[in-house]
Amino acid sequence: MSSSYDEASLAPEETTDSFWEVGNYKRTVKRIDDGHRLCNDLMNCVQERAKIEKAYGQQLTDWAKRWRQLIEKGPQYGSLERAWGAIMTEADKVSELHQEVKNNLLNEDLEKVKNWQKDAYHKQIMGGFKETKEAEDGFRKAQKPWAKKMKELEAAKKAYHLACKEEKLAMTREMNSKSEQSVTPEQQKKLQDKVDKCKQDVQKTQEKYEKVLEDVGKTTPQYMENMEQVFEQCQQFEEKRLVFLKEVLLDIKRHLNLAENSSYIHVYRELEQAIRGADAQEDLRWFRSTSGPGMPMNWPQFEEWNPDLPHTTTKKEKQPKKAEGVALTNATGAVESTSQAGDRGSVSSYDRGQPYATEWSDDESGNPFGGSEANGGANPFEDDSKGVRVRALYDYDGQEQDELSFKAGDELTKLGEEDEQGWCRGRLDSGQLGLYPANYVEAI
Protein backbone atom coordinates (compact mmCIF):
# COMPACT_ATOMS: atom_id res chain seq x y z
CA MET A 1 0.00 0.00 0.00
CA SER A 2 1.22 3.50 -0.78
CA SER A 3 2.67 5.15 2.30
CA SER A 4 1.21 8.53 1.30
CA TYR A 5 -2.35 7.28 1.47
CA ASP A 6 -4.69 8.60 4.15
CA GLU A 7 -8.42 8.09 4.56
CA ALA A 8 -8.83 11.84 4.93
CA SER A 9 -7.83 12.14 1.30
CA LEU A 10 -11.11 10.44 0.36
CA ALA A 11 -13.07 13.46 1.63
CA PRO A 12 -14.40 15.80 -1.08
CA GLU A 13 -11.78 18.38 -2.02
CA GLU A 14 -12.55 21.81 -0.70
CA THR A 15 -13.07 24.31 -3.49
CA THR A 16 -11.39 27.67 -3.01
CA ASP A 17 -12.72 31.08 -3.93
CA SER A 18 -9.73 31.81 -6.14
CA PHE A 19 -10.13 33.49 -9.50
CA TRP A 20 -8.22 30.56 -11.06
CA GLU A 21 -10.84 27.99 -10.08
CA VAL A 22 -13.14 26.84 -12.87
CA GLY A 23 -16.05 29.30 -13.26
CA ASN A 24 -14.78 31.89 -10.79
CA TYR A 25 -14.16 34.38 -13.60
CA LYS A 26 -17.90 35.13 -13.53
CA ARG A 27 -17.40 37.81 -10.86
CA THR A 28 -15.24 39.73 -13.31
CA VAL A 29 -17.89 39.33 -16.01
CA LYS A 30 -20.64 40.43 -13.62
CA ARG A 31 -18.68 43.61 -12.90
CA ILE A 32 -19.38 44.76 -16.47
CA ASP A 33 -23.14 44.47 -15.92
CA ASP A 34 -22.76 46.14 -12.53
CA GLY A 35 -21.01 49.07 -14.22
CA HIS A 36 -24.04 49.70 -16.43
CA ARG A 37 -26.36 49.54 -13.42
CA LEU A 38 -24.14 51.91 -11.44
CA CYS A 39 -24.41 54.46 -14.25
CA ASN A 40 -28.20 54.26 -13.84
CA ASP A 41 -27.85 54.63 -10.08
CA LEU A 42 -25.70 57.74 -10.45
CA MET A 43 -28.19 59.29 -12.88
CA ASN A 44 -31.04 58.61 -10.42
CA CYS A 45 -28.94 60.10 -7.62
CA VAL A 46 -28.28 63.27 -9.64
CA GLN A 47 -31.92 63.54 -10.65
CA GLU A 48 -33.11 63.36 -7.04
CA ARG A 49 -30.61 66.04 -6.00
CA ALA A 50 -31.82 68.24 -8.86
CA LYS A 51 -35.38 67.94 -7.53
CA ILE A 52 -34.15 69.00 -4.09
CA GLU A 53 -32.36 72.02 -5.54
CA LYS A 54 -35.47 73.02 -7.48
CA ALA A 55 -37.74 72.65 -4.45
CA TYR A 56 -35.36 74.61 -2.21
CA GLY A 57 -35.08 77.39 -4.77
CA GLN A 58 -38.86 77.62 -5.02
CA GLN A 59 -39.18 77.71 -1.23
CA LEU A 60 -36.72 80.60 -1.08
CA THR A 61 -38.68 82.47 -3.76
CA ASP A 62 -42.01 81.95 -1.97
CA TRP A 63 -40.49 82.93 1.38
CA ALA A 64 -38.94 86.10 -0.07
CA LYS A 65 -42.18 87.13 -1.77
CA ARG A 66 -44.23 86.68 1.39
CA TRP A 67 -41.86 88.50 3.69
CA ARG A 68 -41.15 91.31 1.25
CA GLN A 69 -44.87 92.09 1.26
CA LEU A 70 -45.05 91.86 5.05
CA ILE A 71 -42.08 94.18 5.50
CA GLU A 72 -43.46 96.70 3.01
CA LYS A 73 -46.76 96.77 4.93
CA GLY A 74 -45.13 96.62 8.35
CA PRO A 75 -44.02 99.42 10.67
CA GLN A 76 -40.30 99.19 9.92
CA TYR A 77 -39.03 102.22 8.01
CA GLY A 78 -35.98 103.88 6.57
CA SER A 79 -32.59 102.36 5.92
CA LEU A 80 -33.20 99.41 8.24
CA GLU A 81 -36.26 98.52 6.18
CA ARG A 82 -34.06 98.48 3.10
CA ALA A 83 -31.48 96.35 4.92
CA TRP A 84 -34.17 93.90 5.99
CA GLY A 85 -35.49 93.81 2.44
CA ALA A 86 -31.97 92.97 1.23
CA ILE A 87 -32.38 89.59 2.93
CA MET A 88 -35.28 88.93 0.56
CA THR A 89 -33.15 90.01 -2.39
CA GLU A 90 -30.49 87.57 -1.24
CA ALA A 91 -33.09 84.79 -1.16
CA ASP A 92 -34.20 85.56 -4.71
CA LYS A 93 -30.64 85.55 -6.03
CA VAL A 94 -29.70 82.38 -4.16
CA SER A 95 -32.88 80.79 -5.48
CA GLU A 96 -31.71 81.58 -9.00
CA LEU A 97 -28.33 80.02 -8.23
CA HIS A 98 -29.97 76.83 -6.96
CA GLN A 99 -32.05 76.71 -10.12
CA GLU A 100 -28.77 76.96 -12.04
CA VAL A 101 -27.42 74.06 -9.98
CA LYS A 102 -30.49 72.05 -10.93
CA ASN A 103 -30.05 72.87 -14.60
CA ASN A 104 -26.34 71.99 -14.54
CA LEU A 105 -27.02 68.66 -12.83
CA LEU A 106 -29.66 67.67 -15.36
CA ASN A 107 -28.36 69.23 -18.56
CA GLU A 108 -24.65 68.58 -18.06
CA ASP A 109 -23.86 65.89 -15.49
CA LEU A 110 -26.80 63.56 -16.06
CA GLU A 111 -26.59 63.87 -19.85
CA LYS A 112 -22.85 63.25 -19.72
CA VAL A 113 -23.33 59.95 -17.88
CA LYS A 114 -26.20 58.97 -20.14
CA ASN A 115 -24.18 59.52 -23.32
CA TRP A 116 -21.10 57.72 -21.98
CA GLN A 117 -23.19 54.75 -20.91
CA LYS A 118 -24.73 54.57 -24.36
CA ASP A 119 -21.31 54.58 -26.02
CA ALA A 120 -19.70 52.11 -23.59
CA TYR A 121 -22.42 49.45 -23.40
CA HIS A 122 -24.03 47.94 -26.49
CA LYS A 123 -27.22 45.93 -26.04
CA GLN A 124 -27.73 42.70 -27.96
CA ILE A 125 -30.92 41.56 -29.63
CA MET A 126 -30.99 38.42 -27.48
CA GLY A 127 -30.45 40.44 -24.30
CA GLY A 128 -27.40 41.42 -22.31
CA PHE A 129 -24.47 43.50 -23.46
CA LYS A 130 -21.93 42.81 -26.17
CA GLU A 131 -19.08 43.63 -23.77
CA THR A 132 -20.35 41.10 -21.23
CA LYS A 133 -20.61 38.34 -23.83
CA GLU A 134 -17.12 39.04 -25.19
CA ALA A 135 -15.64 38.75 -21.71
CA GLU A 136 -17.63 35.58 -20.98
CA ASP A 137 -16.52 33.96 -24.25
CA GLY A 138 -12.90 35.02 -23.72
CA PHE A 139 -12.69 33.49 -20.25
CA ARG A 140 -14.49 30.32 -21.30
CA LYS A 141 -12.12 29.82 -24.25
CA ALA A 142 -9.05 30.45 -22.09
CA GLN A 143 -10.25 28.08 -19.37
CA LYS A 144 -11.59 25.23 -21.53
CA PRO A 145 -8.31 23.23 -22.05
CA TRP A 146 -7.30 23.61 -18.43
CA ALA A 147 -10.79 22.72 -17.22
CA LYS A 148 -10.62 19.53 -19.31
CA LYS A 149 -7.29 18.58 -17.73
CA MET A 150 -8.70 19.32 -14.28
CA LYS A 151 -11.58 16.97 -14.99
CA GLU A 152 -9.11 14.20 -15.95
CA LEU A 153 -7.06 14.96 -12.86
CA GLU A 154 -10.10 14.69 -10.62
CA ALA A 155 -11.01 11.32 -12.15
CA ALA A 156 -7.44 9.99 -11.78
CA LYS A 157 -7.26 11.14 -8.17
CA LYS A 158 -10.60 9.53 -7.41
CA ALA A 159 -9.48 6.22 -9.00
CA TYR A 160 -6.21 6.26 -7.04
CA HIS A 161 -7.94 6.96 -3.73
CA LEU A 162 -10.48 4.20 -4.39
CA ALA A 163 -7.68 1.70 -5.18
CA CYS A 164 -5.96 2.63 -1.91
CA LYS A 165 -9.19 2.05 -0.04
CA GLU A 166 -9.64 -1.39 -1.65
CA GLU A 167 -6.02 -2.29 -0.84
CA LYS A 168 -6.46 -1.42 2.82
CA LEU A 169 -9.69 -3.40 3.02
CA ALA A 170 -8.08 -6.48 1.37
CA MET A 171 -5.09 -6.37 3.71
CA THR A 172 -7.39 -6.13 6.75
CA ARG A 173 -9.37 -9.19 5.63
CA GLU A 174 -6.19 -11.18 4.91
CA MET A 175 -4.75 -10.42 8.35
CA ASN A 176 -8.00 -11.31 10.13
CA SER A 177 -8.23 -14.64 8.26
CA LYS A 178 -4.92 -15.84 9.78
CA SER A 179 -6.44 -15.84 13.26
CA GLU A 180 -9.58 -17.70 12.25
CA GLN A 181 -9.50 -21.55 12.30
CA SER A 182 -12.46 -21.84 9.91
CA VAL A 183 -10.55 -20.29 6.99
CA THR A 184 -9.16 -22.95 4.67
CA PRO A 185 -5.74 -22.62 3.02
CA GLU A 186 -7.48 -22.17 -0.32
CA GLN A 187 -9.47 -19.22 1.05
CA GLN A 188 -6.32 -17.83 2.59
CA LYS A 189 -4.62 -17.96 -0.81
CA LYS A 190 -7.52 -16.11 -2.47
CA LEU A 191 -7.31 -13.35 0.09
CA GLN A 192 -3.57 -13.04 -0.48
CA ASP A 193 -4.13 -12.86 -4.25
CA LYS A 194 -6.68 -10.09 -3.67
CA VAL A 195 -4.12 -8.11 -1.70
CA ASP A 196 -1.53 -8.51 -4.47
CA LYS A 197 -4.03 -7.40 -7.11
CA CYS A 198 -5.04 -4.34 -5.08
CA LYS A 199 -1.39 -3.36 -4.72
CA GLN A 200 -1.01 -3.54 -8.48
CA ASP A 201 -4.14 -1.37 -8.94
CA VAL A 202 -2.77 1.18 -6.51
CA GLN A 203 0.50 1.29 -8.41
CA LYS A 204 -1.24 1.75 -11.77
CA THR A 205 -3.70 4.44 -10.59
CA GLN A 206 -0.93 6.30 -8.78
CA GLU A 207 1.20 6.40 -11.91
CA LYS A 208 -1.74 7.66 -13.96
CA TYR A 209 -2.64 10.23 -11.30
CA GLU A 210 0.92 11.55 -11.22
CA LYS A 211 1.10 11.68 -15.01
CA VAL A 212 -2.15 13.67 -15.33
CA LEU A 213 -0.99 15.97 -12.54
CA GLU A 214 2.24 16.54 -14.44
CA ASP A 215 0.27 17.39 -17.59
CA VAL A 216 -1.86 19.87 -15.64
CA GLY A 217 1.29 21.50 -14.32
CA LYS A 218 2.59 21.89 -17.87
CA THR A 219 -0.63 23.53 -19.13
CA THR A 220 -1.05 25.84 -16.12
CA PRO A 221 1.34 28.62 -17.32
CA GLN A 222 -0.45 28.90 -20.66
CA TYR A 223 -3.79 28.82 -18.86
CA MET A 224 -2.72 31.64 -16.56
CA GLU A 225 -1.41 33.70 -19.46
CA ASN A 226 -4.66 33.37 -21.42
CA MET A 227 -6.80 34.18 -18.39
CA GLU A 228 -4.63 37.19 -17.52
CA GLN A 229 -5.04 38.51 -21.04
CA VAL A 230 -8.83 38.42 -20.91
CA PHE A 231 -8.82 39.79 -17.37
CA GLU A 232 -6.67 42.76 -18.40
CA GLN A 233 -9.13 43.59 -21.16
CA CYS A 234 -11.87 43.70 -18.51
CA GLN A 235 -9.64 45.81 -16.28
CA GLN A 236 -9.10 48.34 -19.04
CA PHE A 237 -12.84 48.60 -19.62
CA GLU A 238 -13.46 49.05 -15.91
CA GLU A 239 -10.68 51.63 -15.64
CA LYS A 240 -12.42 53.77 -18.24
CA ARG A 241 -15.63 53.63 -16.19
CA LEU A 242 -13.88 54.48 -12.92
CA VAL A 243 -11.95 57.39 -14.41
CA PHE A 244 -15.03 58.73 -16.17
CA LEU A 245 -17.26 58.59 -13.10
CA LYS A 246 -14.57 60.28 -11.02
CA GLU A 247 -14.58 63.16 -13.52
CA VAL A 248 -18.38 63.33 -13.35
CA LEU A 249 -18.32 63.41 -9.54
CA LEU A 250 -15.86 66.31 -9.67
CA ASP A 251 -18.18 68.13 -12.08
CA ILE A 252 -21.09 67.52 -9.70
CA LYS A 253 -19.03 68.84 -6.81
CA ARG A 254 -18.16 71.95 -8.81
CA HIS A 255 -21.81 72.58 -9.61
CA LEU A 256 -22.95 71.99 -6.02
CA ASN A 257 -20.24 74.03 -4.33
CA LEU A 258 -21.76 77.50 -4.37
CA ALA A 259 -19.06 78.69 -2.00
CA GLU A 260 -16.67 78.76 -4.97
CA ASN A 261 -19.22 80.43 -7.24
CA SER A 262 -18.30 84.07 -7.87
CA SER A 263 -21.97 85.02 -8.21
CA TYR A 264 -22.73 83.46 -4.83
CA ILE A 265 -19.88 85.38 -3.19
CA HIS A 266 -21.12 88.60 -4.82
CA VAL A 267 -24.63 88.06 -3.40
CA TYR A 268 -23.36 88.11 0.17
CA ARG A 269 -20.99 90.97 -0.48
CA GLU A 270 -23.96 93.04 -1.64
CA LEU A 271 -26.05 91.85 1.31
CA GLU A 272 -23.41 92.90 3.81
CA GLN A 273 -23.10 96.31 2.15
CA ALA A 274 -26.87 96.78 2.31
CA ILE A 275 -27.03 95.85 5.99
CA ARG A 276 -24.03 98.00 6.92
CA GLY A 277 -25.70 100.87 5.06
CA ALA A 278 -28.45 100.99 7.68
CA ASP A 279 -28.09 104.23 9.68
CA ALA A 280 -30.03 104.50 12.93
CA GLN A 281 -29.52 108.27 13.21
CA GLU A 282 -30.72 108.82 9.66
CA ASP A 283 -33.85 106.77 10.36
CA LEU A 284 -34.52 108.67 13.57
CA ARG A 285 -34.18 112.02 11.78
CA TRP A 286 -36.51 110.83 9.03
CA PHE A 287 -39.15 109.73 11.52
CA ARG A 288 -38.86 113.01 13.43
CA SER A 289 -39.45 115.02 10.25
CA THR A 290 -42.30 112.86 8.91
CA SER A 291 -44.10 111.72 12.06
CA GLY A 292 -42.65 113.70 14.96
CA PRO A 293 -41.99 117.25 16.13
CA GLY A 294 -40.24 118.07 12.86
CA MET A 295 -43.51 117.97 10.91
CA PRO A 296 -44.94 121.28 9.64
CA MET A 297 -48.06 122.57 11.41
CA ASN A 298 -50.80 125.06 10.51
CA TRP A 299 -51.12 126.65 13.90
CA PRO A 300 -54.54 128.23 14.70
CA GLN A 301 -54.97 131.84 13.57
CA PHE A 302 -57.84 134.28 13.83
CA GLU A 303 -60.14 133.99 10.81
CA GLU A 304 -62.74 136.66 9.94
CA TRP A 305 -66.17 135.43 9.10
CA ASN A 306 -67.01 135.90 5.46
CA PRO A 307 -70.72 135.65 4.66
CA ASP A 308 -69.94 135.17 0.98
CA LEU A 309 -68.06 131.92 1.64
CA PRO A 310 -69.97 128.65 2.12
CA HIS A 311 -70.12 127.13 5.53
CA THR A 312 -66.79 125.55 6.35
CA THR A 313 -67.09 122.04 7.65
CA THR A 314 -64.81 121.23 10.48
CA LYS A 315 -62.59 118.18 10.40
CA LYS A 316 -64.61 116.69 13.20
CA GLU A 317 -67.80 116.94 11.13
CA LYS A 318 -66.07 115.42 8.10
CA GLN A 319 -64.72 112.54 10.11
CA PRO A 320 -66.83 109.42 9.54
CA LYS A 321 -68.54 107.92 12.48
CA LYS A 322 -66.20 105.57 14.28
CA ALA A 323 -67.08 101.93 13.82
CA GLU A 324 -67.36 99.57 16.65
CA GLY A 325 -63.58 99.53 16.64
CA VAL A 326 -62.97 101.64 19.77
CA ALA A 327 -61.44 99.84 22.69
CA LEU A 328 -60.76 101.12 26.19
CA THR A 329 -57.26 100.17 27.20
CA ASN A 330 -57.23 100.86 30.95
CA ALA A 331 -58.45 103.22 33.62
CA THR A 332 -56.50 106.12 32.14
CA GLY A 333 -58.95 106.25 29.25
CA ALA A 334 -56.51 105.78 26.36
CA VAL A 335 -58.19 104.74 23.10
CA GLU A 336 -56.93 102.59 20.23
CA SER A 337 -58.56 100.87 17.26
CA THR A 338 -59.51 97.24 17.60
CA SER A 339 -57.46 96.44 14.55
CA GLN A 340 -54.43 97.61 16.50
CA ALA A 341 -55.56 95.77 19.60
CA GLY A 342 -55.95 92.64 17.52
CA ASP A 343 -52.35 92.85 16.37
CA ARG A 344 -50.50 90.75 18.90
CA GLY A 345 -46.95 91.72 18.04
CA SER A 346 -46.54 90.12 14.58
CA VAL A 347 -45.58 92.12 11.53
CA SER A 348 -47.64 89.64 9.50
CA SER A 349 -50.82 91.05 11.03
CA TYR A 350 -49.74 94.67 10.67
CA ASP A 351 -50.90 96.98 7.90
CA ARG A 352 -48.89 100.14 7.40
CA GLY A 353 -51.87 101.73 5.64
CA GLN A 354 -54.25 101.32 8.55
CA PRO A 355 -55.85 104.61 9.72
CA TYR A 356 -54.78 106.33 12.90
CA ALA A 357 -56.97 108.56 15.06
CA THR A 358 -55.83 112.08 14.19
CA GLU A 359 -58.50 114.08 16.00
CA TRP A 360 -58.87 114.67 19.70
CA SER A 361 -61.63 116.59 21.34
CA ASP A 362 -63.01 117.01 24.80
CA ASP A 363 -66.43 117.45 23.24
CA GLU A 364 -68.58 114.93 25.06
CA SER A 365 -70.45 114.14 21.84
CA GLY A 366 -67.35 112.38 20.55
CA ASN A 367 -65.93 111.21 23.84
CA PRO A 368 -67.02 107.74 24.87
CA PHE A 369 -66.10 108.60 28.43
CA GLY A 370 -68.49 111.54 28.65
CA GLY A 371 -71.53 110.98 30.84
CA SER A 372 -73.82 113.90 29.83
CA GLU A 373 -77.11 112.97 28.18
CA ALA A 374 -77.57 116.49 26.85
CA ASN A 375 -75.22 115.98 23.94
CA GLY A 376 -76.63 112.57 23.01
CA GLY A 377 -73.28 110.88 23.55
CA ALA A 378 -73.91 108.81 26.66
CA ASN A 379 -71.17 106.38 27.71
CA PRO A 380 -72.18 102.99 26.33
CA PHE A 381 -70.33 101.25 29.15
CA GLU A 382 -72.46 102.82 31.87
CA ASP A 383 -75.84 101.48 30.83
CA ASP A 384 -76.43 97.75 31.19
CA SER A 385 -79.41 98.03 28.88
CA LYS A 386 -77.02 98.65 25.98
CA GLY A 387 -74.95 95.53 26.69
CA VAL A 388 -75.52 91.79 26.46
CA ARG A 389 -74.83 89.48 29.36
CA VAL A 390 -72.50 86.60 28.44
CA ARG A 391 -70.87 83.71 30.28
CA ALA A 392 -67.21 82.65 29.91
CA LEU A 393 -66.66 79.21 28.41
CA TYR A 394 -62.95 79.05 29.22
CA ASP A 395 -60.37 80.67 31.46
CA TYR A 396 -58.61 83.63 29.91
CA ASP A 397 -55.66 85.62 31.27
CA GLY A 398 -55.25 88.99 29.61
CA GLN A 399 -51.92 89.35 27.83
CA GLU A 400 -52.09 93.13 27.41
CA GLN A 401 -53.24 95.99 29.63
CA ASP A 402 -56.37 96.47 27.53
CA GLU A 403 -57.48 92.83 27.91
CA LEU A 404 -59.82 91.36 30.50
CA SER A 405 -59.10 88.29 32.59
CA PHE A 406 -61.79 85.85 33.73
CA LYS A 407 -62.49 82.24 34.66
CA ALA A 408 -64.80 79.75 32.98
CA GLY A 409 -68.34 80.37 34.30
CA ASP A 410 -67.82 84.06 35.10
CA GLU A 411 -70.46 86.46 33.76
CA LEU A 412 -69.70 89.79 32.11
CA THR A 413 -71.35 92.34 29.84
CA LYS A 414 -70.67 92.37 26.12
CA LEU A 415 -70.56 96.01 24.94
CA GLY A 416 -69.95 95.65 21.20
CA GLU A 417 -69.91 93.29 18.26
CA GLU A 418 -66.93 91.14 17.33
CA ASP A 419 -64.34 92.98 15.23
CA GLU A 420 -62.37 91.63 12.27
CA GLN A 421 -59.64 90.37 14.57
CA GLY A 422 -62.07 88.29 16.67
CA TRP A 423 -62.16 90.58 19.75
CA CYS A 424 -65.09 92.10 21.66
CA ARG A 425 -65.40 94.97 24.14
CA GLY A 426 -66.79 94.09 27.51
CA ARG A 427 -67.10 94.97 31.17
CA LEU A 428 -66.62 92.79 34.21
CA ASP A 429 -68.99 93.02 37.16
CA SER A 430 -66.16 94.77 38.98
CA GLY A 431 -66.48 97.60 36.46
CA GLN A 432 -63.22 96.89 34.62
CA LEU A 433 -63.46 97.62 30.89
CA GLY A 434 -61.43 95.96 28.15
CA LEU A 435 -61.15 93.42 25.34
CA TYR A 436 -61.63 89.66 25.29
CA PRO A 437 -61.67 86.91 22.61
CA ALA A 438 -65.20 86.70 21.21
CA ASN A 439 -65.18 82.91 20.99
CA TYR A 440 -64.41 82.53 24.70
CA VAL A 441 -67.98 83.40 25.79
CA GLU A 442 -71.58 82.48 25.03
CA ALA A 443 -74.77 84.48 25.42
CA ILE A 444 -76.77 83.83 28.59
From Swiss-Prot:
CDD domains cross-referenced by the UniProt entry: F-BAR_PACSIN1, SH3_PACSIN1-2
CC terms in the record's Gene Ontology section: axon terminus; COPI-coated vesicle; cytoplasm; cytoplasmic vesicle membrane; cytosol; endosome; photoreceptor ribbon synapse; presynaptic endocytic zone
Keywords for the protein's UniProt record, in alphabetical order: Cell membrane, Cell projection, Coiled coil, Cytoplasm, Cytoplasmic vesicle, Endocytosis, Lipid-binding, Membrane, Phosphoprotein, SH3 domain, Synapse, Synaptosome
Family from the record: Belongs to the PACSIN family.
Naturally occurring in which organism (per UniProt): Pongo abelii
Function summary: Binds to membranes via its F-BAR domain and mediates membrane tubulation. Plays a role in the reorganization of the microtubule cytoskeleton via its interaction with MAPT; this decreases microtubule stability and inhibits MAPT-induced microtubule polymerization. Plays a role in cellular transport processes by recruiting DNM1, DNM2 and DNM3 to membranes. Plays a role in the reorganization of the actin cytoskeleton and in neuron morphogenesis via its interaction with COBL and WASL, and by recruiting COBL to the cell cortex.
Entry's localization field: Cytoplasm; Cell projection; Synapse, Synaptosome; Cell projection, Ruffle membrane
InterPro entries assigned: AH/BAR_dom_sf, F_BAR, FCH_dom, PACSIN1/PACSIN2_SH3, PACSIN1_F-BAR, SH3-like_dom_sf, SH3_domain
A biological-process GO annotation: negative regulation of endocytosis
GO molecular function: cytoskeletal protein binding; identical protein binding; phospholipid binding
Name assigned to this protein: Protein kinase C and casein kinase substrate in neurons protein 1
Subunit structure: Homodimer. May form heterooligomers with other PACSINs. Interacts with both COBL and DBNL. Identified in a complex composed of COBL, PACSIN1 and WASL. Interacts (via SH3 domain) with SYNJ1 and WASL. Interacts (via SH3 domain) with DNM1; the interaction is reduced by DNM1 phosphorylation. Interacts with DNM2 and DNM3. Interacts with MAPT. Interacts with EHD1 and EHD3. Interacts with TRPV4.
Membrane topology: Peripheral membrane protein
Compositionally biased region (Basic and acidic residues): 314-324
Keyword presence, Manganese: no
PTM text: Phosphorylated by casein kinase 2 (CK2) and protein kinase C (PKC).
Gene name linked to the record: Pacsin1
Pfam family, one: FCH
Modified residues (Phosphotyrosine): Y394
Modification Phosphothreonine, positions: T184
Region (Disordered): 173-194, 309-386
Domain called F-BAR: residue spans: 13-283
Coiled-coil positions: 26-275
